[in-house]
UniProtKB/Swiss-Prot annotation:
Gene3D superfamilies: 3.30.70.20. [4Fe-4S] cluster 1 binds at residues 8, 11, 14, 46. Keywords: 4Fe-4S, Electron transport, Iron, Iron-sulfur, Metal-binding, Repeat, Transport. It comes from Butyribacterium methylotrophicum. GO terms for molecular function: 4 iron, 4 sulfur cluster binding; electron transfer activity; metal ion binding. Ferredoxins are iron-sulfur proteins that transfer electrons in a wide variety of metabolic reactions. [4Fe-4S] cluster 2 binds at residues 18, 36, 39, 42. Its cofactor is [4Fe-4S] cluster. This is Ferredoxin. Disulfide bonds: none annotated.
Length: 55
């Protein structure tokens, strides 16, 4: 799964790209690990590289 780091600027680009709607929007964006398919679309879209693979 991917995670959103503190670098997130809450722009919404990632949520728009997620094919399974695993990203919840808010002041802090979060990725639902149960829904995430590891496609990487969100990370590719992030303008500040705030989305990284979980260790």
């Amino acid at each position: 799964a991917y995670k959103i780091t503190d670098e997130c600027i809450a722009c919404g680009s990632c949520a728009d790209q997620c094919p399974v709607e695993a990203i919840s929007e808010g002041s802090i964006y979060e990725i639902d690990e149960a829904l995430c398919t590891d496609c990487g679309a969100c990370a590719d879209q992030c303008p500040v590289e705030a989305i990284v693979p979980e260790d």
